[in-house]
Swiss-Prot record:
Name the record gives this protein: Large ribosomal subunit protein uL24c
Record SMART domains: KOW
Organism: Gracilaria tenuistipitata var. liui
Pfam families noted in UniProt: KOW, ribosomal_L24
Domain of life: Eukaryota
UniProt-annotated location(s): Plastid, Chloroplast
Keyword Disulfide bond: no
Gene Ontology CC: chloroplast; ribonucleoprotein complex; ribosome
Keyword field: Chloroplast, Plastid, Ribonucleoprotein, Ribosomal protein, RNA-binding, rRNA-binding
Function field: One of two assembly initiator proteins, it binds directly to the 5'-end of the 23S rRNA, where it nucleates assembly of the 50S subunit.
Single GO MF annotation: rRNA binding
Assembly description: Part of the 50S ribosomal subunit.
Family (UniProt): Belongs to the universal ribosomal protein uL24 family.
Length: 92
């Protein structure tokens, strides 16, 4: 049986400015760089940063420690207007 393809609607889109309303980054403002609709998550530029340790791939190489942006659930963000410094309260 073939699975039916469904469109998952999100209230935010890539490139929009949002404010985080819940979690350890609460109150911070950032721009969405990627939307993950299947898991209802978004990745915001320079927010929700995590440290990742990478193992050495070759014998002579050394490992790395990199910092990456982790996804945050879309219900924890709200659209934000930079020109008037206010958040848009209604959710779609």
């Amino acid at each position: 049986m073939k699975m039916k393809k469904t469109n998952i609607k999100m209230h935010v889109k890539r490139g929009e400015t949002v404010q985080i309303i819940s979690g350890r980054e609460k109150g911070k403002i950032g721009k969405i760089i990627k939307v993950l609709p299947k898991s209802s998550q978004v990745i915001i530029d320079n927010l929700n940063i995590a440290t990742k340790h990478l193992k050495a791939q070759k014998e002579g190489d050394s490992g790395q420690i990199i910092r990456i942006e982790k996804p945050i659930h879309s219900s924890n963000v709200i659209q934000y207007k930079l020109d008037s410094n206010t958040s848009i309260k209604d959710r779609v």
